[in-house]
Every structure is written in C-alpha cells, then in structure tokens.
Regions:
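Catalytic phosphate/metal-binding cores of nucleic-acid and nucleotide-processing enzymes, i.e., regions
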Residues: 1-109
Length: 109
C-alpha cells in the first residue's frame, strides 16, 4: 500500500509536468503558471491572466492507479469557475491522458 506522502508526491510530479509543458508550449513566464500546493483548494494548475488567455482551461490532475473518473470529472467541473474543465490523468508506466466533455472537444475543432 502506498503511503500518503508517496501518493502526494506522485500527484505533485504530474502537476509539475503539466505546468512545465504549458510553460514551454505557450512560451510563458514561470510566474504565469504554478502548480497548486497539495491540499490547496481549487484548480491544480494556477494561471495568470496572461496564461489564461493562451490556455483557457481549468486543470485537475490525477496520478492514480484506480481512478474514479466520474468523481474526478465532477471535481474538475466544480473547480472550473467559468473556464473549460479538463482532467489530466495517468497511472504508473502509462501515457498521460486528457479528458473533457464532447461539446468542449468539438468547440476546439
């Protein structure tokens, strides 16, 4: 069984990876994107107004072996305010995936 500190570290690593990828992809300043502190309420990735204009999503990150996707999607939606909620998730030795509603996906096309 994984300890609480190991579980939080796993989640923190995913959040930091997502933060770094957003910074790189959108050529943002490091102060524009930060990973939430474990246990902090709201979105897992905190964005400045400048970052939000380039990346208009509210991010929930989950690094879990057995993910309850419905609870996780609800959490993403509850924390999204007026932004498009996305759930970024992975488990050990897997790719990282993103999920969002069909309507939000089609709006991107």
């Amino acid at each position: 069984m994984i300890s609480t500190s190991s579980r939080k570290a796993k989640g923190r690593r995913l959040q930091n990876k997502v933060r770094d990828l957003i910074l790189e992809k959108f050529n943002l300043h490091p102060d524009d994107v930060r990973s939430a502190i474990m246990g902090e309420s709201g979105e897992d990735i905190k964005l400045s107004n400048s970052a939000r204009s380039k990346f208009p999503f509210s991010v929930e990150c989950k690094a879990q072996e057995k993910l309850n996707i419905w609870d996780s999607l609800k959490q993403a939606e509850d924390n999204s305010n007026s932004h498009t909620p996305i759930l970024i998730f992975k488990r050990n030795r897997s790719k990282t995936y993103v999920t969002l509603s069909l309507e939000d996906f089609l709006d991107l096309l």
